[in-house]
């Protein structure tokens, strides 16, 4: 072999080996960058800007992935059988197939009927004639507390109502049924009803409902159903506008007992709907937590600002155990209706045998401020919490069941609201009805600041358990013959042409069970 040949061999070797190796490394790097675009969070390009990191607050349990085994056919059959079993007018809360459900079921015939979920603001009315004469149908009304069943929303969309299922899925009737539930949107015109034409255990396919048959009032969504499925309400403002919804802030803690060294306070950020508060109460029951004081309203904006909870004052004798005096709730956790909460843990300071210091720790007073990040100078809510050892927490106070109150038929309610709303020069409007119901001038002035004073006073009449005959008499004595005529026309349309009678706290209309608001 010549010297020239022997000198070329190393360079040839480098070309043969180096080029494939370099190509493989370059290909691997390209694949890595490509995967970053499709799998956000797994890796990051070196030149990408760092994303802001929020304070280290543990994610709530609802954010953790759940691996649930696929249900078998017998399990699915047993699930729906239990869900549609008549509950004898009771509202049942139960964990079924990894879902926390609140439901009621009954049988209805040609006379119709009504299903109500207690303390949630949810009802389903099956009108007379919706079922063929001689047949009986089992129907169910379900509040779904499984947050994974809610629609997948963008940052511009907010969840403002519960997810409600009417069953059996796909059931249809001769006449439309009326589903009613509460929402917390500040502008009803920005809220839209959604439906998922799927069963409760299937993957959901949420789509907006059209306007016909859907009516969204100031705090209520009413849908005329041609068939049964899943329903909810979503808030989305037009471009250039800001969407807002009402929150209720609820504080919970366990009893403060002698010798207890620590106390945890939890603040829930909930949609301002009855069922959201019931969820928090149910969530606290296993831990012995009870609500402290009334809920406070909060004007929450969809401007993508996180919610801050800042500790401002702790009474003497107690100290904050947490590393920080402020907590942060991600905006979308609230905007998408995930019912998040944040907590502070407090510890008694050592008394050192000082009776005066020990007496100070028998009571704890806490003040907190909550606001959206960056908006502290514009809007802050102040939360005050107080607990003491002297309170009787050992035995829960007896729960007095409020008396049943009649609810005016929706179409009549709206007609009377429209007639009574305009202010009359003589005061012969909703204000006169308020006076007849015993309200003083100060309360009437307060009602005048409401979005619909007429609706508020009609709801008060419902809570006083008044009958249609009593309302007809009041309108006649007020010389509001237009309202009296509207009531009389409704009574004349009732079966057999006879007026409704009040019986046992419900409207008895010859077999038609109208809605009862608890």
From Swiss-Prot:
For the region Peptidase S68, give the residue spans. 208-235
Keywords, in A-Z order: Cytoplasm, Membrane, Transmembrane, Transmembrane helix
Residue ranges constituting the Death domain according to the UniProt record:
415-494
The UniProt annotation puts the region (Interaction with RELA and NFKB1) at 186-400
Tell me what topology the record assigns in the membrane: Single-pass type III membrane protein
Q: Fetch the Gene3D superfamilies from UniProt.
A: 2.60.220.30, Death Domain, Fas
> What are the recorded Gene Ontology BP terms?
positive regulation of canonical NF-kappaB signal transduction; positive regulation of JNK cascade
Could you tell me which residue ranges are on the Cytoplasmic side of the membrane?
32-518
InterPro entries in the record: DEATH-like_dom_sf (IPR011029), Death_dom (IPR000488), UNC5 (IPR037936), UPA (IPR033772), ZU5_dom (IPR000906)
Q: Does the keyword Translocase apply?
A: no
A Gene Ontology cellular-component term: cytoplasm
- Topological domains, Extracellular: 1-10
Which PANTHER family does the UniProt entry name for this protein?
A: NETRIN RECEPTOR UNC5, UNC5C-LIKE PROTEIN
- Say which family it is in: Belongs to the unc-5 family.
| Listed name of the protein | UNC5C-like protein
Could you tell me which species this protein originates from? Mus musculus
Gene for this chain: Unc5cl
